[in-house]
């Protein structure tokens, strides 16, 4: 099966099982506008529908769908790329690598609300890799096709045995391709991701600290230990989490926050009262702005 055409809705039909060890429903949401509450209700029942409801933007016209020869996988692989209109090859440009959530694709991630608008306004290139398919976990749950750390692998008979390895390698290949083609500022290369992509952000941020000026995991589905944070104790981190997340418990994310605090790390924690799993990232211009503000202030030395 083509990893670009995997039936996405089937993925979220069993998402609760995939995130079994971090699954819970928090109670007591604060008062919000009817429009916001409607989005949260939809996201709780059908997360992929929220992605189908992302508002259009004039900046989407500049999004490019690219394809490269993924030799290690023996197939072509797509990724999405946004280059701001003021890009000048004579000047180093900041780059954001954006990792999509479980069941989504790169096309969805790069269209998160206000992402490309802010990239245009502030002069960032944004690239969204596929991660081989929509459930590879970017290597964060092991190199194979049966993820470690809980039930619900979401693996299919068509998945390669080294799915996790290929998912991680795809991200690194795409990063390399963008750095080769464009004048990327090595002191301003950032990593962000949502849900599965948030877990991938923790994982790849910790594994390759030499690459990133800062990272931004949102509602991160991560199955490793916060003790790993000692490897990036000098890296700035901003974390976004809803306290009413039905798939990733806020309590789990807070363990990582407490560890960052104990290590004396530079971090910002944005916990959204009543926030669900999806809208805190894909439908929150406010949170996206906070991420860009944090990136603007972060350089790798």
Predicted regions and their residues:
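Alpha/beta-hydrolase fold active-site loops
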Residues: 94, 124, 213, 235-236
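Primarily recognizes the serine-hydrolase "nucleophile elbow" in alpha/beta-hydrolase
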Residues: 111, 176-183, 187-233
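Bacterial N-terminal signal peptides
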Residues: 13-22
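Serine-hydrolase catalytic machinery in alpha/beta-hydrolase-like enzymes
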Residues: 34, 72-77, 91, 95-183
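C-terminal catalytic histidine-bearing segment of alpha/beta-hydrolase fold enzymes
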Residues: 34, 240, 246, 250-301
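A domain-start/cap signature at the N-terminus of enzymes
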Residues: 27-95, 167, 254-257, 267-268, ...
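Bacterial N-terminal signal peptides that target proteins for export
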Residues: 2-14
